[in-house]
Amino acid sequence: MSGSLSRKTERQRRARTEAISARLLAREFFNRDPREVGRELLGKIIVRTERSKLLAGRVVEVEAYLGAGDAAAHAAAGRTQRNHVLFGPPGHAYVYFIYGVHYCLNISCMPEGEAGCVLIRALEPLTGVPEMARARDLNPLDPTSVRDLRKLLSGPGKLCEALGITRMRD
């Protein structure tokens, strides 16, 4: 009985994986105002493969940064070596290190030459939860360690740590 159950579970996981990785967003999706992109990113799924394991989460929280006119944006003071990705083609990852501790994942928006981005603040874990928990030094077998799945990827630093996103992805 457990053998058939595990085969069924594996088939369901495989079907979900295929559905998750079925459609990539075109770069044109990001070639517009970050506020629009941010609203439409909610509910989309971010997929990453780490050591041949599929990791996926649904976008549940974002922040839009408008570039030169936005004092909180990294691009507010213009192009630098650090933020040059924001001024490039839309749809690229802009990853930065903050407080000497955390990485943050942004996606560039706006036409090339203009800066804007959407910060991915939180994801709802979908696939690869044990791997994501281990990447955050949590024990996936300990119910108290991953008691609330919403907290596993709740925050830009947590989701980057869980998905293995660093400046190497910038």
Where are these regions (language model features)?
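Conserved, well-structured core segments that form or line functional sites
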Residues: 2-170
